Amino acid sequence: MPGVIMNQDNINGRGLGLHDQLNGVSSAPAGSSQLGNPVGLHNGSLPTNGVQHPDSRGSDENYRTKMMLSASGDPPELQHIVQGFFPLAKLLNRSAQQCWNDLADLVAELAEIQVPSHDSNFSPISPNTKVLGNQSPENVRKKLRALEFAQKKRGEFIKLLVLSQWSRQAADVSRLIDIQNFIRTQHQAYAGALQCMGDMKRDLVRAQVANPDLNTALEVLLRGEVVSMPDLGYRPPKPLTPKSTLKKMRKINRVISTRLALHDDIPLAFQKYRVHDGRVTFVVPGEFELDLSIGEEDVTSQFFFVDIRFLFSPSPSIPAGRMLSELDIKINDTLRNGGLSECFNWLHNLILTNKINILARQASELSRSLWSNVLRSELLHRTLVLQYWASKPNTKSWLEIGIRRGPRESTIGGMRPPSLGLRWIRDGQEVNSDDVEFDTDSLSVDRLLRSAIALHISHILSSAFRRISEKLLYSNGSLSLHAYLTRTEPGDCQLDVQLTASRRLRVAIEPLSGAIVLAATPNTLERVDTDRNMDRSTIDDIVSRVGRLRCAAAIEEVESQVKMLGFISVSPRNVRIDARSLFPANVLRFSFFWHHHWERSWLLAATSSMDGDKWWVVQTPSADSVTINRSLDAAVHHASSAVRSAQVICNLLLPAEQPDYSSLADLGHCLSGFLAIYANARFLQDLQFIKIWPHLEHLRIGPGLQVPDLNIEYEATKLPEALRVALPAGFKRKTFVKKTIRLAFHGIDRCRKVAIMVAYGNLSTSFPALGDLVAEDDHSLVLQKTGTGFALRLLASPGYPVVVALLESLQRLECVLSVYEILRRKKMDARFLSLSRLGFAYGPNKELLAQLDIGETQPQLPTEMDPLKLAFRTGHLFHYRLSISFDHSNPHRRIQGPLASNLNRPTAEAGLDTLTEILSFTLPLMQALDRFMANPSRNESSIVHVTVRNATSFQIHYPYEKCRLRLVAHQHQNQPVWVLRDVLSFQDGSCEPEFKHKLQERLYNSKGTGWRGLGNGVIAEPDHIGDLLDELDRCLASTKANTTPKALDSRTSHDAPAANNQSPAIRPEKSVEAADMHGGFVNRNLQQKAGPASQKTDVITID
């Protein structure tokens, strides 16, 4: 009886009830007993075959009720049906509660789905310019699941709405149910009456007894026999003795053997038989043994069934009794009608059906026990379908066991009989089932399923093995991969994958459910194994998950190791790098690193894929416009919107052996070193003026974490104009360095936090004992003592190119060697040498020391360091300027300024060659001036001013005598000489007459050792210039003896300096005649053309 939903008003009696008025009869009150027994029959008892059955109320009460109803004339009241009714409010409460429970389950299910983080800056935009939001597969699946839940619950509540509207008319439907129940009860009463009458008639037949045969009974009683019964003359057989029994058995055996050998057509399946004990036993392997015998010797007579035994297990036993009798009858009928062939066919089909039923029963037992919810079995006619891994989505797999028929011929000939066949559908496709262990002699569904599942798992793991082994990491033997497969036990099938040098993964498939089981050693992060696509096949899922786990393990291992070396992990979002477009598509995991020692525009990236793990060097645009500290927060905020370059530098993330502290330190050293080398190679390639090898694309970290060296082709003449050093005027560029320069990395200076770069090269000219001139504490330059090799040490942050400094140092080295070569040619001894200065000794005994300094202007950083700007820049970036310095005891210190100026003047006579000649030429003069300084006999009246015009031109001024003399160098008969002449004081008469007369007499018209007068001057050899000055001093002393101090005071009050200045001083004079400032020995014409000087001159005051 279907249930009825009543609204609350009708249930509680607030509306019109069914008992208010039914069939025109007023119903009983709500509290009457009729509601307590709604199903009972109250219209009287039901008579059957004229017999009235009393009910619980008694016949008298029923009779009185009938009489009352008949007296009233109203029909009896219909039974009111309330069984199965329940209120609508209960249904609504249950539905609301169920909706709440389902919603809670949905929330928990959606929480388990991991949605990757979403960056709003990279959200896709629809054609209508609306942001689509996160469109990842996980997020879409969550939305679809929520939509399906809402749609389902909406349908349920629509049904509740329809029921609530229908329940308002439930009273009429309830009345109809009562009428239907009454009609059905009447039909049942009619049917019961007919059935009772039929049963009675059948029972009466058995009760009939035939009339007794009194005559035969009397004859038997009187005579003990019946004469009327015929006598057939049968005699009982004689009892058999053992001998006769044996004889008959042997006779039957001969008859059966003869018959089978000569007359009967024995089917192929019955070819194996034996005759014994008066019977023949046909043996069908794996099925049954059939015992038959004969009833007579006629060869055309049939065989008779004796016994049958099943040869497979488990096999049912045939119980004695009805079943055995029916089997006996059926076999004998088959033997009589069809012979042995038909008997075999019938028994064979019986056995096949029996085997299928046994397998079906085993499958049913398995599905209710160990294989619950994972095995489904269904018997269709004589085909058993076994679906394993039933809870697994996507494609299905099952086994079909049925009777195989077909025109397959046997090995002997003829058609093969039907047999049990196995059909294997693996992942929706039929495959060969020959390897499945299907033993029809020993039936076992469990063993069959295990064999099929083992083969299925072996297929999955072998396919995954084949696909993983095609990856480069496993094909070249970098990582190991082993598969253990079996055909019988699925739990023994497994795939061992080496993830990294220290981590391994075991892949297996749970035999019952088909779920993939991954076990990592040590345990890998579970969060990386969350992306499980249900639409993928199992093989694709295994390969994908193994790839993700391997790459995640590799990157995790690298991150944990390199962070101990001070590396900082950088998020690609902070540097605005689109890693998916930067790296190949097969890269599954990546991580960016930076170090606080490096330049901000360089990053290292570690990528991992199934084809290999690689280190990348990534160059981002310079962040000059952004102020960045070298702190953790600032280090990850690179101002880069794109990647300038990215290149693979190593195919190994960590050392091949088990990493320890030393190998990790080597890794950090190698990465920083390679970055330093690569930055220089990138700079040179962008410069496009200098060849390098190996080429930038072939630059890799060598075996054993060896930092490669960079070979540079160096030619100063082929450098861009900006990088060619501007040498001092008159300095000729000469090549001393061979073309090939090798740039190598030599570690990190931990104090300065810079990379140590060393450039190795060879000199084209061998200089003996040159290496001894470099100081041991000078680390910027090393010269080989026994060869031509040299090394330059450069410092810079890893990632900052040292190319500009290297090229400048090489040109500086050539400049220093050029100076050294000139000094050696001039017979001067070099005492020490560096890239910025060169010390040498000169003089007759090499007792005087001098130092040549090489200075330059510094480039403007950082814009000047851009290789593209340097390549097209006009003008030199570096300008060299030579200077010379002397120690305090060197007499040439007095003309140090003019000598330095003479080194850098753009004239033909200027230069280092001229400087060395000037040093030798002026040395006697400077020594003579030093003697003047050291003369203790000088007094106030013998002050002399010596003004240095240039290195070869001097003015001697005697303030008290108002006399000015000029001492210049001249060429006389191709020999350099000193010429002493008067300057203006003789012509204008300002000079003291007595002093003038003395000069004319003792110098101009006289001669001495190494000097002689010219009438208007004196010429002296360079080595005897001291003798001339001594004679001049004596001339002055003799003049002073004839003059008074007072007159001397009056004469010197206007032009003499203060008398209290007793020490030599250098001060400028403005009204003196300019001397020729050209370096070297000037000729007479050049000396006469010299004009007044526009620069300050030095005055040497000697007292």
Swiss-Prot record:
Biased composition (Polar residues): 23-36
A Pfam family assignment: Med14
Main location: nucleus
Single Gene Ontology BP annotation: regulation of transcription by RNA polymerase II
Gene Ontology CC terms: core mediator complex; mediator complex
Gene: rgr1
Coiled-coil ranges (or none): none
Entry protein name: Mediator of RNA polymerase II transcription subunit 14
Family assignment from sequence similarity: Belongs to the Mediator complex subunit 14 family.
Transcription regulation as UniProt keyword: yes
